[in-house]
Amino acid sequence: MATINQLVNNPRKRSVVKSKVPALKACPQRRGVCTRVYTTTPKKPNSALRKVARVRLTSRFEVTSYIGGEGHNLQEHSVVLIRGGRVKDLPGVRYHIVRGALDTSGVNNRKHGRSKYGTKRPKS
């Protein structure tokens, strides 16, 4: 345990927490323009073709973001909304595209968990 005089001369350092989503610049979401839309394969135990997009943000960052849900309408020059949230089996993908916002359509024929995929309530 440090003495009072030791703490006066050399105060305790606050640990600096590094942001997991630096491109958002402390905002909840950011707008961006797709520069490339493509598929990529996940890390070792998993196997799939994951849909991702390279996005140029208004904060001047270029990030890779994941397109969740089945099917999408994104192409180059689509304007999208980005939120934080990494994809564990895709290295370097630390952002998600928000479905149902700006140029991104919601997922068709989705019944459960609709709010996560920008789907309107079905006509009963």
UniProtKB/Swiss-Prot annotation:
Residues 102-124 are annotated as: Disordered. SUPFAM superfamilies: Nucleic acid-binding proteins. One of its GO terms (molecular function) is rRNA binding. Keywords: Methylation, Ribonucleoprotein, Ribosomal protein, RNA-binding, rRNA-binding, tRNA-binding. It holds the Pfam family Ribosom_S12_S23. The keyword Transport does not apply. GO terms for cellular component: small ribosomal subunit. PROSITE patterns: RIBOSOMAL_S12. Residues 109-124 have a biased composition (Basic residues). InterPro entries: NA-bd_OB-fold, Ribosomal_uS12, Ribosomal_uS12_bac. The modification 3-methylthioaspartic acid is found at residue 89. GO terms for biological process: translation. Gene3D superfamilies: Nucleic acid-binding proteins (2.40.50.140). PANTHER family: 30S RIBOSOMAL PROTEIN S12 FAMILY MEMBER. Part of the 30S ribosomal subunit. Contacts proteins S8 and S17. May interact with IF1 in the 30S initiation complex. With S4 and S5 plays an important role in translational accuracy. Interacts with and stabilizes bases of the 16S rRNA that are involved in tRNA selection in the A site and with the mRNA backbone. Located at the interface of the 30S and 50S subunits, it traverses the body of the 30S subunit contacting proteins on the other side and probably holding the rRNA structure together. The combined cluster of proteins S8, S12 and S17 appears to hold together the shoulder and platform of the 30S subunit. Belongs to the universal ribosomal protein uS12 family. This is Small ribosomal subunit protein uS12. The gene is rpsL.
